[in-house]
């Protein structure tokens, strides 16, 4: 969602407008669109994660998933993370992206996990609920209760409804 970061750190040259237009083109067709996002990149701030959320709010997709960055060995970003002291060169990145392995001072693991957990809520629910979604990011009793309530709202309002397919099964 942050063009400058994507261009310099991820070496992606597509503009935000090109991404939005491509997603809208797919949405206008009969092709289902699943958007896979990543948060928790090295030096990424909460504001930059929200640039990605804002980008996702500008087009329709059948699903908006979110993973947490992992510095896989042999990649440019792995070398960058080791050089910055965010990750030990002998450590292996996890295959599952439930937590950030990076040791960064500007953002906590819990904050990255919270944004990733609530990503779909942030992309679909109205902005006037963002303060409640932020509560749902927390892994305490209040946060868990808020998350359950917001997920009920999300599922009843935005989640695709189950429909029968040709084979007689159910697809969601």
Placement of each model-derived feature along the sequence:
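Short, solvent-exposed turn/loop segments enriched in Gly/Ser/Thr/Pro and often Arg
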Residues: 39-43, 67-76
């Amino acid at each position: 969602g942050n063009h400058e970061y994507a261009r310099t750190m991820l070496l992606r040259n597509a503009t935000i407008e090109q991404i939005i237009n491509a997603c809208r083109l797919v949405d206008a067709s009969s092709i289902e669109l699943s958007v896979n996002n990543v948060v928790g990149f090295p030096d990424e701030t909460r504001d930059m994660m929200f640039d990605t959320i804002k980008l996702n709010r500008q087009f329709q997709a059948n699903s908006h998933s979110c993973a947490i960055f992992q510095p896989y060995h042999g990649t440019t970003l792995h070398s960058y993370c080791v050089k910055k002291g965010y990750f030990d060169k002998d450590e292996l990145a996890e295959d599952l992206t439930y937590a950030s392995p990076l040791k960064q001072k500007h953002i906590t693991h819990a904050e990255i996990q919270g944004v990733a957990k609530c990503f779909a809520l942030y992309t679909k629910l109205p902005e006037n609920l963002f303060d409640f979604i932020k509560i749902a990011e927390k892994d305490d009793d209040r946060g868990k209760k808020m998350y359950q309530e917001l997920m009920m709202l999300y599922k009843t309002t935005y989640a695709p409804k189950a429909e029968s397919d040709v084979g007689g099964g159910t697809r969601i």
